[in-house]
């Protein structure tokens, strides 16, 4: 495949045919998903570079096929593979090689209509050379190797680039132009590779497979994130408490614990949450929706995490064990509360007397001493009492009657 990245205008006239490779329908079927993705990406990049460098020609039929998501095949006729993997500077050599092969009477590799082992190996070689050419032209193109002088300056933001092609791509950010449209849903993209990644949503194609568990992904970035699970690596650390996370978004969610930020508010009652998933579960409270049902007892829950926690009551599973004493718990929250026994941490403090507790429930019980009530319980009591109930009856509904003290209880006569 012609893996050519045109970063400056060539000294000789160049057509799209000079930097493209065609497949027959038979040959296209022999390529695996990774090779097809590489081919599409390079062809679209070649076309966009030629256009950006000022070459005027009508859109090639091959590009129209790729943008529509069709296969790039042509009629089953022999054609030259010698151009694959070469740069613009090798154009003369490519034509000479082509002419020599044509007149020597030998069949070209890759022109095997039956798709034999020799032909398939040749095609793989072409794709491999294409991938290598892509890397070579990126690393040692006309603007020099990595670390070369950044001579191409963006006039709008002042950012500099070592390649003119990178500057051209960067300018699209300022213009807001999105020239690549999805033929199925019409969504627009700034880069051709972004369109190719998006089209996998429609096709269901997942070319990136995890070598350890075989799980597949539509994007290489998602595969890289997934592989962190197998490595056990947790590269994202919280600056406040040092807790480590596998994903950057998990660290962002955790940081809200320290900042107290709750950006997700319920439009019905105004209650706010630090996670969008918690808001979704909460909204089911208003609708009375409980979509997650236990298969053993038919009990239903608002969230899948609640269902999983409940199912452990049937299985007896307690996967969260304390490292200090070995005590195990069904849920992570139970383990977190238990750890405070060892650490002595008491994060729940009474606003009236300053006494602290390891559990929120114990704080609520203690606040009854001061006559305080939980806001949620008070609101429930007002609803039960009905509108306009402000007398002693509402107070009785809000709190249960106090238990008599031991000293006030009459002693029972002993039985003899």
Swiss-Prot record:
Primary residence: nucleus
C2H2-type zinc finger locations on the chain: 152-174, 180-202, 208-230, 236-258, 264-286, 292-314, 320-342, 348-370
Locations listed in the record: Nucleus
Gene3D superfamilies reported in the protein's UniProt record: 6.10.140.140, Classic Zinc Finger (3.30.160.60)
InterPro entries: KRAB, KRAB_dom_sf, Znf_C2H2_sf, Znf_C2H2_type
UniProt-annotated stretches for the region Disordered: 86-125, 368-416
Stretches with biased composition (Low complexity): 394-416
GO cellular component, one term: nucleus
One example of a Gene Ontology biological process annotation: regulation of transcription by RNA polymerase II
Pfam families: KRAB (PF01352), zf-C2H2 (PF00096)
Domain KRAB: 14-85
Highest taxon of source: Eukaryota
MF annotations from Gene Ontology: DNA-binding transcription factor activity, RNA polymerase II-specific; RNA polymerase II cis-regulatory region sequence-specific DNA binding; zinc ion binding
Keyword tags: DNA-binding, Metal-binding, Nucleus, Repeat, Transcription, Transcription regulation, Zinc, Zinc-finger
Family, as annotated: Belongs to the krueppel C2H2-type zinc-finger protein family.
Functional note: KRAB domain-containing zinc-finger protein that represses B1/Alu SINE transposable elements and modulates the transcription of nearby genes in a tissue-specific manner. It regulates glucose homeostasis and lipid metabolism by modulating the expression of the endocrine cell-defining transcription factor, MAFB, in pancreatic islets and, the fat metabolism regulator, ACACB, in adipose tissue and muscle.
Name this polypeptide is given: Zinc finger protein 92 homolog
Organism of this sequence: Homo sapiens (Human)
């Amino acid at each position: 495949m012609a893996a050519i990245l045109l970063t400056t205008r060539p000294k000789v006239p160049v057509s799209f045919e000079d930097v493209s490779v065609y497949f027959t329908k038979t040959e296209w079927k022999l390529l695996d998903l990774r090779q097809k993705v590489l081919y599409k990406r390079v062809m679209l990049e070649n076309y966009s570079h030629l256009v950006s460098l000022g070459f005027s020609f009508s859109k090639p039929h091959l590009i129209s096929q790729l943008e529509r998501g069709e296969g790039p095949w042509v009629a089953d006729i022999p054609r030259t593979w010698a151009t694959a993997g070469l740069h613009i500077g090798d154009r003369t050599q490519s034509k000479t090689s082509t002419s020599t092969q044509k007149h020597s009477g030998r069949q070209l590799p890759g022109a095997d209509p039956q798709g034999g082992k020799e032909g398939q190996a040749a095609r793989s070689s072409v794709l491999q050379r294409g991938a290598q050419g892509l890397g070579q032209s990126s690393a040692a193109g006309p603007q020099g190797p990595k670390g070369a002088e950044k001579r191409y300056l963006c006039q709008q933001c002042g950012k500099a680039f070592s390649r003119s092609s990178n500057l051209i791509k960067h300018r699209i950010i300022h213009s807001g132009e999105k020239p690549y449209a999805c033929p199925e849903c019409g969504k627009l993209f700034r880069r051709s590779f972004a369109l190719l990644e998006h089209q996998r949503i429609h096709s269901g194609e997942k070319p990136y497979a995890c070598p350890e568990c075989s799980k597949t992904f539509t994007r290489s970035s998602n595969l890289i994130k997934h592989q962190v699970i197998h490595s056990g690596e947790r590269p994202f650390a919280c600056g406040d408490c040092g807790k480590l996370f596998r994903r950057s978004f998990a660290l962002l969610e955790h940081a809200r614990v320290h900042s107290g930020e709750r950006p997700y508010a319920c439009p019905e009652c105004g209650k706010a949450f630090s996670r969008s998933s918690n808001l979704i579960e909460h909204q089911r409270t208003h609708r009375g929706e409980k979509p997650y049902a236990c298969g053993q007892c038919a009990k239903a829950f608002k969230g899948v995490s609640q269902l999983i926690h409940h199912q452990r009551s049937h299985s007896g599973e307690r996967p969260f064990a304390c490292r200090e004493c070995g005590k195990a718990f069904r849920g992570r929250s139970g383990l977190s509360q238990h750890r405070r026994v060892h650490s002595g941490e008491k994060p729940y403090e009474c606003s009236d007397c300053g006494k602290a507790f390891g559990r929120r429930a114990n704080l609520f019980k203690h606040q009854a001493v001061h006559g305080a009530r939980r806001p949620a319980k008070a609101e429930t009591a007002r609803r039960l009492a009905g509108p306009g109930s402000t007398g002693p009856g509402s107070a009785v509904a809000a709190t249960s009657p106090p238990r008599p003290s031991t000293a006030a209880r009459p002693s029972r006569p002993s039985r003899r």
